[in-house]
Swiss-Prot record:
One GO BP: protein transport
Principal subcellular localisation of the protein: cytoplasm
Name of the protein described by the UniProt record: Nascent polypeptide-associated complex subunit beta
Record keywords: Cytoplasm, Nucleus, Protein transport, Repressor, Transcription, Transcription regulation, Transport
Ranges where the record places region Disordered: 16-36, 118-160
Native organism: Phaeosphaeria nodorum (strain SN15 / ATCC MYA-4574 / FGSC 10173) (Glume blotch fungus)
Biased composition annotated in UniProt, kind: Acidic residues: 135-145
Pfam family for this entry, one: NAC
Length: 160
């Protein structure tokens, strides 16, 4: 680009200095405060009460994983059978939490935990079988000869 043309462009886009309007970068802030306010108003309509001293909440999913909340905020409305649990949830595998949650479970929960463990084991076996199939494919690749540098089939046909 020509230096004179560049200097003219810079002069027309002057930032700062005496008497020039300042250019400001427009920043768009997406506030999560509005979502929190909406949540609080919805909870007030349900007449929920906060429940204190809950250290952790575990939600078991059908695929064998667990949504784990450590130190969540819990609000409950017993008459409407509504519980609000919010905080930072982490998606963890069942095996990570098993030793710590066994003493917290009742007899009915232990039965459901056994079912989850069985489904988890079957999922792991399926993954293992898929891995075995992939290993078998690697064995089939051993039949294919490797290319060697320097060997040229065209030169061999010309010699014969």
């Amino acid at each position: 680009m020509d230096q004179a043309k560049l200097a003219r462009m810079q002069a027309s886009v002057r930032i700062g200095g005496k008497g020039t309007p300042r250019r400001k970068v427009k920043k768009v802030h997406k506030s999560s405060g509005t979502d929190d306010k909406k949540l609080q108003t919805a909870l007030k309509k349900l007449n929920v009460q906060p429940i204190q001293a809950i250290e952790e909440v575990n939600m078991f999913k059908s695929d064998g994983n667990v949504i784990h909340f450590s130190a969540p905020k819990v609000h409950a409305s017993v008459p409407s059978n509504t519980f609000a649990i919010y905080g930072n949830g982490e998606d963890k595998e069942l095996t990570e939490l098993v030793p710590g949650i066994l003493n917290q479970l009742g007899p009915d929960s232990l039965a459901s935990l056994r079912k989850l463990a069985e489904s988890y084991q079957s999922m792991q076996k399926e993954k293992g079988e898929d891995g075995d199939k992939k290993d078998d494919d690697d064995e089939d690749d051993d039949d294919i000869p490797e290319l060697v540098a320097g060997d040229n089939f065209e030169s061999k046909t010309e010699v014969e």
